[in-house]
Each structure stands twice: as C-alpha cells, then as structure tokens.
Amino acid sequence: MKHIRNFSIIAHIDHGKSTLSDRLIQVCGGLSDREMDAQVLDSMDLERERGITIKAQSVTLEYKAKNGETYQLNFIDTPGHVDFSYEVSRSLAACEGALLVVDAGQGVEAQTLANCYTALDMNLDVVPILNKIDLPQADPERVAAEIEDIVGIDAMNAVRCSAKTGVGIDEVLEVIVDQIPPPEGDPEAPLQALIIDSWFDSYLGVVSLVRIKNGVLKKGDKFKVMSTGQNHTADRVGIFTPKQTDKTELKTGEVGFVIAGIKEIHGAPVGDTLTLAKHGAEKPLPGFKKVKPQVYAGVFPISTDEYENFRDALNKLSLNDASLFFEPESSSALGFGFRIGYLGLLHMEIIQERLEREYDLDLITTAPTVVYEVLLTSGETIYVDNPADLPAINNIEEMREPIVEANILVPKEYLGNVITLCIEKRGTQVNMVYHGNQVAVTYHLPMAEVVMDFFDRLKSTSRGYASLEYNFIRFDPADMVRLDILINGDRVDALAMIIHRSNIRHRGLALVEKMKELIPRQMFDIAIQAAVGSQIIARSTVKALRKDVTAKCYGGDVSRKKKLLNKQKEGKKRMKQVGNVEVPQEAFLAVLKLNE
C-alpha cells in the first residue's frame, strides 16, 4: 500500500492539464507510441472539439522511481471549468494529493483558485507545478511569487516543466512519489468502496469507477450498494491503463472499475458506497454534497413522437452526469417535453449538444430561468423554476431572487470595464484586493444576470483576461415580475419570462417587435401583446391579408362599395373569433436570441 499514490490535477482551462496527463501516460508506458493520441483522456468528441475536459477519467500507471522502487500511480483527471466544479470535488474525494498546474505565462486564474481551495478543504496535499515554460512569454519567477501571494502555498521550488516538449516530466513524477502521501485504509476491515463515476455501456450495463477505501474487492464477490440495498456480483474488476485491463482483485487504496451487469440505470448512483453482501460495513462513506441545479430550461423534442427516445436518452445521460435533474413538462405551444436543471449555461449547451449528437434528437429549448423563492400572502414559501408556475400577482407577498458571490480575477488595466459591467448587472461590490498586476474583485450579483450572458461579456470587456468563479449564497427580495406574451388575447406559456421590473418596457417592446416579424400573416389581424399581470405594456399587430373586394365596381354609388367593405369586415370579425394562430418554432428561438 505504501507504493500507491492517488492524485489528480487541478488547473484553469487551457493551462495544459490534458497534455500533461498525456505525457505522464507516455513516460510510464501506459500506451505504445502508436496508440498515443493527443488528449487521450478527453474521450468525448465534444471534449476534443471545444478543448475542454467535461468528465472525470482515471488511469493507473506503473512508475519505477529513482530509488529503485516501483510505484502504482492512480491519476484521476478533472475538468477545469466552473460549471463542472462538482465533477472536480468528486475526483478529489478519491485522492490524497493534487497537482496544481499553472501556466507560467498566464499565472493564477479564478478557477485554479476555487478548485485549489476545494482541495485544501478536503485536506489534500497540493503540489504546485509550473507548466508551459517553453513559451517565450513564460515568466516562472513572477508566477511562483503569484502562487504564494494569491493561493498561499510555497512555490519557490515548484517543478518547472513543459508538457508539450516533455521537459521536466520526470521531475513531476518524482514529486508525486515524494510529496503525495500514500493512501490510508485497513485491508482487513470490511469493504468500503466509493463510487467516483459511473456510465452506461450498452454491452456491459453499468460500469462504475471506484476507489477502495478499506478492505478488498475480488472478482466474483457479492456486494451490495448501500443506498439502494441491492446485491450484485462483481463480474469483472480491473483498472484503466487507459485501456480496460481486467484484474482478479482491487486492493485497499486502489482505483479501478467494477462491472456487475447492473442493467437498470440508477443501480449504482455516484457518490455511493459499495460493501460486501455478507460481513458488510456498518455505515457508508461520507459521499459528496448533492449539487442543486442553478438554471432551468424547458426542452422539447421538435416532433412529438421522439418523446420516448428523448426520455431514454436523458436517463442514460443522467447516469453519467450526476448533476442533471429533469422532470416531465407539457406546454400548450410545444407539446410534451422535460424541464431540465443545469449547473450553468455551459453545462446546458454541452448537455444539449450531447443529446443531439449521441442520441440523434432534434430539440428546442425555452429561455433559461433560475429558481426564485416566493413568499405567498398565505405565509407559505414556494420555489419556482418555471415562469408558467408563478402564482398570480395579488397572491405574492414577496419575490426573492438568488444572489451569487462572484470572484473575478482581472489585470489592473481592465478593472474599470469589469466594474462597469458588474454595476450594469445590478451587482454590489463586496471586496477588492490587489495582487501585483492582478486585482481580485468580489461582487454580489443576481444569478439571473450571471446565467444570461455575463461570462461572455466579461471575457469581451477584458479581452479574455478576466476569469470568473461564482457560487450561490442566498435569496434576496427583488422586484421581479412575469412578462407574458399574448397572441390574440391568449397567453403563450412557453414565451413567459421572469424579469426585473426596471427592464420590462424595453424587453416587452423588443419581444413584441421580434414576434411581429416572425408570425406569418393570416386572413385576420393578429394582436401581439406583452403584459405584466393585467396591464399591457407593449403591442403590435400583424396586419391581415385581404382581397380587394371593390375591384369589380366601375364608378357607381359609394354606398355599393361601403356595403362590400362592411361585408368583408364582418367576415374577418367572424374569422377572428374562430381562428387560432400557430406560433412557428423560429419565434421561440427568437426569444432566446433576444438577449444577444
């Protein structure tokens, strides 16, 4: 056991995490040079295209150290993006140490900091590593000082390496062996294994990635999942070298996979504990905190007969992504679909792309909303994540919106732009600290403003240098109202949105104008109105198409023309009473695009 090292790598996006892991695999001979592929661990197409890591992966490597001993290194890859911080805390729970990789040109960024604090809270040993020293703009001295100043760990003797050229990789491996402690645990105790991740394989059923904390799991053992109490037999156990390699047993401290032919999707929830069916452990391991979705959106299949496939796809996806939440929803305009909860907008985009790619679905998404806390006049408090569920205005005592604490790291010269942006988004400044050339600003911002387009705007006002990390802190009373869109006097539920009272005029007008362009003309006038409660704040009319009924009159009396025109008017009036308007799909998409 003292030759096992479990570690993960924490880094900001693009600081070279995945490349460094490729090098470690290559040096330790996990794959032959022919199979070596850039970003081996980012196995999803989407991860490669966007160049980000989304899912945690694991690899077991053998390393012969300079002291002549052979060590087993279990390396768990983690994502760096703020929306996937949950995946990170999960990976860290299985480790004893973490490598903090910092780009020697860019320096410390907000996410690095957030994930690093998560690691320190879990009592992991954090080892700093300066990467990309081959770049001309690399300044390892400055960055080392920055790490000490901002993060507060000693970085003067930090290993300097370049994952791209392979310089300093051996030193990295030595540091892992020297500075990261071996796992603790009792091989004789009853089995306790933590499920770090699980995914669905159409041939094998559920595959779970586990970290053995105590005891041993052998092939053929009967084990039980502690939260569900169900028993299964371990058909195969093994490790990833990144290839799946079968073994006869997983010992204490090791990280590997278990396949038990579990067919039903929620058979092995992530964060759960496995133990043996006979002499099992008394209590489960402390898992992870369940994440609450921050953003909700209704997602509907474009053709209604895809509803079943859509449900299956969501079930399979939620196994692999523990933070996904969904419940069925129906809309009079869009038919049947699901209300899905996400951790943030990037998460939402990724999930939607994965559904469209991996499961071949055509989907339409309504505007994203956050969760509001609503105090009713009856004294009870409810949580609303769908604008259509908001009670009538006269039943609401107080609306409270979620507030996030946003930590922004930005170079001095862009500070002004960032502050202007935060004020525009109704933020209040809490703190500001200068660290050398960087400034750390803390703001309290309404989450609704953050999820819309804050991140993109932040990047563009700071030329991409600012970095953001945010978490939910509390609900604050706010003057929020529901903006409804009425078409010929009927509310269209899928177009409703909850916004701040100061924005309603501007938003209502823009929406109504946009809808006017998109709704095709009918044989009668269509009134498009934006309303708050019973008060109409904006209106426009799609004019009717009409036939020229007076064309056949040559001269003659005006009363003849009047008669024909009045007859046409009567007809249009009757038509309007029975006619109903189809709202085209583009109109729903337009509402989303309006924020841009």
UniProtKB/Swiss-Prot annotation:
GO terms for cellular component: plasma membrane. Its EC number is 3.6.5.n1. GO terms for molecular function: GTP binding; GTPase activity; guanosine tetraphosphate binding; ribosome binding; translation elongation factor activity. GTP binds at residues 14-19, 131-134. It is found in: Cell inner membrane. Residues 2-184 form the tr-type G domain. It catalyses: GTP + H2O = GDP + phosphate + H(+). It is a peripheral membrane protein. SMART domains: EFG_C. HAMAP family: LepA. NCBIfam families: lepA, small_GTP. PANTHER family: TRANSLATION FACTOR GUF1 HOMOLOG, CHLOROPLASTIC, TRANSLATION FACTOR GUF1-RELATED. This is Elongation factor 4. It comes from Shewanella sp. (strain ANA-3). The gene is lepA.
